[in-house]
């Protein structure tokens, strides 16, 4: 517990096991910082790194609400559905707006902001597989209009998910959504 006081997952540790890193975005950052390659995944300048951080931070509320929402789909409440809808709209509309001006979320090249976006949004889109449970409780899936409402965000998700480096890790996550 010294290295990781919260004891939650996901978690990563320094090679000697002395330092624990927890939470997905922190693990993304640590992985890129530890890389010996200059691949630009955390931006190329300090300001680009801060912009990447901004998108990762904006995704935190979305990710937290999505976790609560997805785990409770069978007993969804009006409040939970409304909170998730607001978090979804805020996050995905910001991504869509950013993609008006460049091909990637935070900078002009692929960064961990894009990786986090694909992973978080891909996970959330699984709600569509639970449409029957939602309808039974009087709700529609929040993401039903994703393709039309946020076309740039949708195209970005699907184009990145089709790339081998994403497809190899996503597997069948986006199948049927």
What kind of region is each of these model predictions?
Residues 52, 105-140, 144-152, 160:
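GST superfamily/GST-like fold recognition
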Residues 32, 36, 120-121, 170:
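Active-site-flanking alpha-helical
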Residues 60-63, 92-96, 157, 161:
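Structural signal for well-ordered, non-membrane alpha-helices
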Residues 37-38, 97-108, 131, 163-170:
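Surface-exposed helix-capping loop/turn segments at secondary-structure junctions
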Residues 10-11, 89-104:
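Short amphipathic alpha-helical segments and their helix-coil junctions
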Residues 84-95, 120, 153-156:
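Alpha-helical packing segments of well-folded alpha/beta enzyme cores
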Residues 1-85, 90:
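GST-like domain detector, emphasizing the conserved glutathione-binding G-site
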Residues 143-177:
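Long hydrophobic alpha-helical segments typical of transmembrane helices together
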């Amino acid at each position: 517990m010294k290295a990781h006081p919260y004891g939650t997952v996901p978690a990563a540790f320094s090679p000697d096991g002395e330092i624990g890193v927890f939470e997905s975005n922190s693990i993304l950052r640590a992985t890129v910082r530890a890389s010996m390659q200059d691949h630009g995944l955390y931006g190329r300048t300090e300001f680009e790194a801060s912009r990447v951080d901004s998108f990762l931070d904006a995704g935190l509320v979305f990710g937290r609400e999505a976790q609560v929402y997805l785990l409770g789909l069978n007993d969804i409440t009006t409040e939970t559905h409304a909170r998730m809808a607001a978090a979804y709209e805020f996050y995905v509309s910001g991504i869509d707006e950013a993609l008006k001006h460049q091909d990637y979320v935070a900078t002009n090249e692929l960064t961990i902001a894009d990786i986090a976006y694909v992973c978080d949004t891909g996970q959330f889109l699984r709600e569509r597989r639970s449409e029957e449970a939602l309808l039974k409780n009087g709700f529609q899936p929040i993401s039903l209009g994703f393709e039309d409402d946020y076309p740039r965000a949708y195209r970005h998700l699907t184009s990145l998910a089709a790339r081998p480096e994403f497809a190899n890790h996503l597997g069948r996550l986006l199948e049927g959504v």
